[in-house]
Amino acid sequence: MAHKLLNDTFLRALLRQPTDYTPIWLMRQAGRYLPEYNATRARAGSFLGLAKNPAFATEVTLQPLERYPLDAAILFSDILTVPDAMGLGLEFVTGEGPKFARPVRTEDDVARLAVPDIDATLRYVTDAVREIRTALTDAQGRQRVPLIGFSGSPWTLACYMVEGGGSADFRTVKSMLYARPDLMHRILDVNARAVAAYLNAQIEAGAQAVMIFDTWGGALADGVYQRFSLHYIQQVVSQLKRDHDGEKVPVITFTKGGGLWLDEIAETGVDAVGLDWTVNLSKARERVGGKVALQGNIDPSVLFAPPAAIRMEARAVLDSFGNHPGHVFNLGHGISQFTPPEHVAELVDEVHRHSRAIRSGAHAPA
C-alpha cells in the first residue's frame, strides 16, 4: 500500500531531481553512540536479540529520527543475516565481533551453500520492514521519511564467510581467491542470487530504497575488484525490482576505498554511488557526469571536533558538490560509537541550513 511521504527529499535526490536542500542520513545512525540504543540493546540481551526481534529493530530504527530531523530511516539489521540464514552459525563474541561456527573453506563447504528461503529464514527482517513502515506513518496515512533496506555485497559477505569472522589482512579469503578462483566464483554466485532475493523481499515488504554495502571491496587489487566484487554487484543490481507500489525504488552501492573505480561503479545500473572521505566530491561529480547521484562523504572523525569545526567541514563538503541535483549527504563510513550525540545535531542542522542557502543563491560555492 502506497503512503504519502511528508518528506521525499532523499528519494528525489537519489533520482537526481531538484530539492530545496541536501538530504542527510548517516550510516549506522541507529547505534551505540545513542544512550537510548544501548538501553534497548540491554533489554534485548544481545545484538542478535535486538536484530532478530522486529519490535526492538523498529524501536532502534526510529531512535535517531526522534533526536534529529534526518531525511531517511534505515532498517536496523546486520549484513551477516544472509550467511547466517545459509546455516553458517553466526554469533557475536564480546570484544571480537562476529564469528561463524561453520566457515566456508573447502569444496564440500561450497557445495553445501545454497540461496536460503528468505521467507522461512529471514522473516524477522521483512517483518521489521513492515513494522517500521507502519511506525513511520501517521493516522492519515502520511509517512515521515522513506525507509532504506540494505545488504552486504557478495564479496563482502564472502570475506566473513571464508575468514569465519572479521580479518585484518583477509589472508584466508584472498588465498582462496588466488589459489581456487573457481571456488570463490561459486561462493559469489550463490551470494549474488541470495542478496538479490533478500533485497527484493525487503522491497516487497516496503523498503523504498536499497543499499549494497561493499565494505571490503577496497581490499582488492585493481582488476581483481572488477572480477570478484563489481561483477557480482552488477549481477545483484540487474535482478532487483526497481518499481514497487507505482514508485521507483532507487539503488545505492558503496565500496569503501573504491574511489579509483567510481566510473565503473557508476556503470552498474545503480542510481547512486556512496563515497568515502578520500574522494574529492567535486571531481567525482565531474567524473560521473550526472549519470548517478552521489552520497557522502564527510570523515566520521569530524564529529569529534568542536561544533564550529563540524559546521565548517560540512559546508566544505556541500560547497564541493555545489548547487547541483543528486547529492545525499552522509558520512564516508559508519558513525563511531564514541561520537557525542549533540555533535550529530550540529552536523544535521548545518547541512540543512547551508544547503538551503546554496539553493537560494544566498551562498555561492567557491
From Swiss-Prot:
Protein name: Uroporphyrinogen decarboxylase
Pathway the protein acts in: Porphyrin-containing compound metabolism; protoporphyrin-IX biosynthesis; coproporphyrinogen-III from 5-aminolevulinate: step 4/4
Gene that produces this protein: hemE
Enzyme Commission number: 4.1.1.37
Subcellular localization(s) per the UniProt record: Cytoplasm
Family: Belongs to the uroporphyrinogen decarboxylase family.
Predominant place of localization: cytoplasm
Species annotation: Paraburkholderia xenovorans (strain LB400)
GO terms of molecular function: uroporphyrinogen decarboxylase activity
Disulphide bond pairs: none
Gene3D superfamilies attached to this UniProt entry: 3.20.20.210
HAMAP family assigned to the protein according to its UniProt record, in alphabetical order: URO_D
